[in-house]
């Protein structure tokens, strides 16, 4: 099992054992990945696929988790990660003529929706640890550095000619 750090700006919802092929669910998930919450809700309500309803419920549940548990505003939420994995296959037998039976395989999938709060952009500020050698011993300090990327060619940089 891989342990990951919990991000305090992300909220997720997980749906398991959804009776649907993962290929059909991925067709819808690929359309909403990276979009805002409000835009995603409009897209899912208007798409004509059967896979939209369980995904709509998951996105709505993730947004409810974000607003209730973390206090995020729904206008600032963006779908940062959406993935569909294959679940277990439900196997049944269908009775046929003359005592025979045919197998029926119902595929299931698990869907994970991760919403990220964009009002606080954590990529702009990175935390660095550095050590200082002082007479009392080594001291470890944390420093927050602004890591925004400035385009020096278009914002009055060195070689900008007008």
From Swiss-Prot:
InterPro entries in UniProt: Ribosomal_uL22, Ribosomal_uL22_bac/chlpt-type, Ribosomal_uL22_bac/org-type, Ribosomal_uL22_sf
Keyword Chloroplast tagged: yes
Gene Ontology molecular functions: rRNA binding; structural constituent of ribosome
Keyword Secreted among record annotations: no
Keywords: Chloroplast, Plastid, Ribonucleoprotein, Ribosomal protein, RNA-binding, rRNA-binding
Pfam families named in the record: Ribosomal_L22 (PF00237)
GO biological process entries: translation
Record-linked HAMAP family: Ribosomal_uL22_B
Name of the protein in question: Large ribosomal subunit protein uL22c
Species annotation: Cucumis sativus
Gene name for this UniProt entry: rpl22
